[in-house]
Design a protein with these regions (language model features):
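N-terminal "domain-start" segment that seeds a small globular fold
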Residues: 22-61
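Short, internal strand/loop/helix patches
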Residues: 118-149
Length: 182
């Protein structure tokens, strides 16, 4: 009887585990995103991120004009976010002329430690900030991290990605190849 009960518990656990929905990559063209605010306002959102110095705020006005932009929502303890950051750093030459905005809602100390480890802000085109008011996740309807939103030189949405992406996929989307929506 004891073994039957344990087998039932194991079966129930596995059934519950595999019954969880998998969140696929949902680019901007996905119908599931039709009602998301970023689809109604497909330009760089009016973010207000607490900077690494803990006293200034990063807004879209701080971005260099006429550049492609990546808005990446991440968590400092997310392994996929770390892999995405490492991939961008490995091919950084391809990203050096873009604005890269990295936003998190996690504690300020974790964000600062993440930057100290990856040294992202040693690159003048990379800005990291804390989304204290939790504006970006509902704006983009974020389900999984990292979340990337790509914008053209005029600040218009190209596409979005959830989960780690190869740098070629990101660059192809910017160049109009692959999964870009515009």
């Amino acid at each position: 009887m004891k073994h039957a009960f344990l087998a039932f518990i194991a079966f129930a656990f596995c059934h519950i585990l595999y019954a969880q929905p998998k969140v696929p990559n949902q680019p901007a063209t996905d119908p599931a995103n039709a009602e998301a605010p970023f689809m109604k306002f497909p330009t760089i959102p009016p973010f207000h991120l607490l900077g690494l110095d803990s006293s200034t705020y990063l807004t879209p006005a701080d971005l260099k004009k006429g550049r492609k932009t990546i808005v990446m929502f991440f968590s400092p303890d997310c392994e996929h976010c770390k892999h995405q950051t490492e991939a961008i750093l490995a091919d950084f030459n391809d990203f050096k002329d873009m604005n890269i905005v990295m936003a998190t809602y996690q504690p300020f100390s974790d964000m600062k430690e993440f930057n100290e480890h990856y040294k992202m802000t040693e690159h003048s085109n990379v800005k990291i900030g804390r989304d204290e008011k939790f504006v970006l996740p509902p704006f983009y309807k974020i389900h999984s991290l990292p979340y990337l939103a790509l914008y053209d030189k005029k600040g218009n949405l190209i596409t979005t990605f959830e989960g780690t992406q190869k740098t070629e996929v990101i660059l192809n989307a910017f160049n109009g190849n692959g999964t870009a929506s515009h």
